[in-house]
């Protein structure tokens, strides 16, 4: 019987699919900003959401590095404009390469307040404060109708604001009228 390697186990176990995923060109102050936008739509609280979004984002960054590594290997076989050093070749990432930022939004379609963790640190077991500077954290970007005010609903340039407001007051018949 042949043993599975760690990479085969990992690739099998972390195959995940986002609800919605788009490449976005955002313009601010006349400058273009490119990013990857993931959307997780929840109607119930997912109590491990910080881990889930961190995993999705990390998988996208790893995918970008992997695509870059293929380009580096291909350029090594062809005439490259700049020689790649051994560290760049091994990592699959040149010193001046850059990743496209990934943002994951969690859209909670429920009138109740999200009572789950909002960051990885909210999920940690108790630990000594002396190690806190060494522990990484990861927060979720949550849109929860119950936590939005009237002025927040107005910020949406589509009917999504109206839908979220409807969700917020769906349990309150008096405010629905």
Provide a role label for each language-model segment.
Residues 1-177:
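Elongated, amphipathic alpha-helical interaction scaffolds
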